[in-house]
Amino acid sequence: MMKLFVVTSLKEYLGDISKIFNQANIRVFSTVDIIGYKQGTPNNLLDDWFASGEEDVDSMMIFSFTSEEGADHGMELIIGYNKRIKGNFPVRAFVLPVEKSV
């Protein structure tokens, strides 16, 4: 089944994320510049998604329509990558099922 594999990271990690996509056999992907904000809001599910504190962060969203195997391998590689990097900005990733497409 086709999946949508989505990764968000700091712009400086884009080269590493490109290598991860390649290792996961994901050869075609798109990128979008994003700026993540976190303000003093009540607790919610996104509290730990962006940086702590009230700053903005230059980030990238990298995504691809890929096989389930590619998405699963990509997630495993992201988990390993996060264990190796230092800092407060881990790479985030998620997978969504693609039920229909035209």
Each language-model region and where it sits:
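Positively charged, small/polar-rich N-terminal and surface patches that mediate targeting and assembly
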Residues: 1-102
